[in-house]
């Protein structure tokens, strides 16, 4: 039994390594992602003003080497969320991002948090970006917007 549990655990860890950095035929991958955990306060990084906890936005900025930094500000998750796994796929000029909550989701509350990721392998051009939140088994579209990627790109998208 212990041997089966060990092999199952090893398989799950290997699958997380493969699936956690989604990619496609063009080898565009997320090579960094971060989840802030529940926040007590939220601030607009452009103005420094405090944001209401239910005001979500996506900040984005081009980085050198064909990279794109994305920050989903005030993403709402269950207070019992233990971590958020970011899964990406790039198909042509369409970028899909799934923010997958990990935990038992038993708390009767939600809290704002920030989810960040860094995509690589992009080239100059127009891209559509769709961000989905997956809290249990269903992924729900949160944001869908377009960018014109080049080395000077910097902005945000607000609902």
Regions found by a protein language model. Give the residues of each.
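Sec-dependent bacterial lipoprotein signal peptides
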Residues: 1-19
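Bacterial Sec-dependent N-terminal signal peptides
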Residues: 16-37
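Short, compositionally biased P/S/T/A/G/V-rich stretches that sit at domain boundaries
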Residues: 31-63
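Contiguous segments within soluble domain cores/interaction surfaces
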Residues: 52-53, 66-105
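An anionic, turn-rich surface loop/hairpin at beta-sheet edges
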Residues: 98-120
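Short acidic/polar inter-strand loop motif in beta-rich domains
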Residues: 103-106, 135-142
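A short tyrosine-centered beta-strand micro-motif
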Residues: 127-129
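Short beta-strand elements
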Residues: 142-158
């Amino acid at each position: 039994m212990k041997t089966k549990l060990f092999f199952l655990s090893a398989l799950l860890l290997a699958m997380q390594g493969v699936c956690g950095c989604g990619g496609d035929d063009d080898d565009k991958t997320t090579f960094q992602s971060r989840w802030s955990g529940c926040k007590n306060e939220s601030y607009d990084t452009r103005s420094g003003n405090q944001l209401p906890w239910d005001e979500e936005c996506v900040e984005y900025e081009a980085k050198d080497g064909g990279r794109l930094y994305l920050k989903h500000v005030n993403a709402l998750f269950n207070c019992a969320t233990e971590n958020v796994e970011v899964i990406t796929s790039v198909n042509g000029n369409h970028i899909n991002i799934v923010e997958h909550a990990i935990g038992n989701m038993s708390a009767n509350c939600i809290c704002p948090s920030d989810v960040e990721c860094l995509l690589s392998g992009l080239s100059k051009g127009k891209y559509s970006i769709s961000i989905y939140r997956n809290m249990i088994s269903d992924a729900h579209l949160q944001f869908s917007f377009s960018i014109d990627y080049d080395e000077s790109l910097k902005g945000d998208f607000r609902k």
